[in-house]
Amino acid sequence: MAYPAISPAVIVRVEKEGEILLARHVQRIPDLYTCLAGYLEVGESAEDGVRREVREETGLEVGDVVYAGSQPWPYPNQLMLAFKARWASGELALQADEIAEARWFDPADLPAI
């Protein structure tokens, strides 16, 4: 019997003092801001993957990582796990090969999708 190979990924809404962190990615739609996301590594919990992805892409540390839901992703064999997290420390230091820009947005002033 063959079992499906699934690639789990995480997406996270990072909050700080009432604002939400959104980023524009280097290799995606130029003006589209999204939450941070990435694939889990072998042997890594989803919560640890959230912390690692945020740290790698922005230089920030997060805490209070809470599962919010899941959905199949539009790419073959992928499952997206959504989380909320709170900024814990650090200043933005972007991973230049992945993130073009990241900034904090007031929920009442989010960029258009």
Question: What feature does the model see in each segment?
Answer:
Residues 11, 21-24:
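Beta-strand scaffold of nucleotide-dependent catalytic cores
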Residues 16-18, 89:
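Short acidic-glycine loop/turn motifs at beta-strand connectors
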Residues 1-12:
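Cys/His-rich short segments
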Residues 40-113:
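Unchanged
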Residues 28-31:
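A conserved beta-turn-beta hairpin within the catalytic core of GNAT-like acetyltransferases
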